[in-house]
Amino acid sequence: MNHPTPRRPLLVTTLTAVCAAIASLALPLAAHASSHREAPSIAGSPRVDGTDFYMFKSYEGVAADGTGGRAGYVTMIANYQPLQDPYGGPNYFKMDSNAIYEIHIDNNGDAKEDLTFQFKFSNAFKAISIPIGNVTVPIPLTQAGTVSVPNDPNLNVNEKFTLTLIRGDRRTGNAFVVNNPSGGAVFDKPVDNIGNKTIADYAGYAAQHVYTVAIPGCAMPARVFVGQRQEAFAVNLGVIFDLVNAPVGVITDRNLINAAAANSIQDKNVTSLALEVHQSCLTQGSETVIGGWTTASVRQSQLFNPNPPSGYDVSSRVGGNYVQVSRLGMPLVNELVIGLPDKDKFNASVPSGDAQFATYVTNPTLPALLSAVLPIGNAAPTNL
């Protein structure tokens, strides 16, 4: 579970039944996706905006013959909160405590979740105050000094999360709490990478938040980590959305396939929800293929207080059932395939209902748009 350290300034740090991210456990295939601010509604709710979903066979310490190390494990990473600037203080990028974030696994091919790993976040506000003259005054920052350990005393707000495994339907299935090996059912999340004066060794600090856990009903131990990581989606979004504002020769040059332009998003961060689970705990019977996707859901209603009390994140109350507002499985489906009128609908939908979006796949508009802005001839399909 090694991931790039979050960046700081000047530091390198199913449109069908299978349109969920598909990963074969018998073959070395990987599933990945990407979606940043892709729909009108989610663009206004960055804390629940899923940006990427990765699912692949773990390779840490695995020999060429497929043995040793983490062989037999599957890594799942759901990224949220796109385009985080390293200097985005003083509050940085905490997760939405009123939302639930989920990774779903379909292990029988019916485009419905059979397993759901649900993350729920909370903020422990310490209200750190310091004496100023003859009064004690609350500080305005996330931290009151250097930070080096989980739930550091200098953290004014300590972000925590719970992890629940749900077997069957995500709302009506059987729920099992995943416990912290140190006791209880709550895990600490590392504060974002504020900078090297606050956190001298961010990689070492974050590594203290990798937990080895027991998944209920699973004989093999798993690992979980939630925290800020460097953006891994290497696409120059500015150029792409500006009518592909680059020479065709550059775009099609295989020698430049790994080139990162100056205004790419690799200087941004995301928040990763990472799980590493043994394949025997994800599959069903003799089936060796699983599908996976991630969603975020919020309460149906939110009521803002015109005169909020003192406290942390207490300006509103929420209620009602959870409503799905973000969904991500296959790469770029909602971003570049689904039409603008249906992007919010897609984010609220489930894989088993994807037939309603079939026209966007059978009659795609993106090739025609590319033909209109690039001198590459007729790229649009004609065998419709």
Predicted regions and their residues:
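N-terminal secretory signal peptides that target proteins for export/translocation
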Residues: 1-11
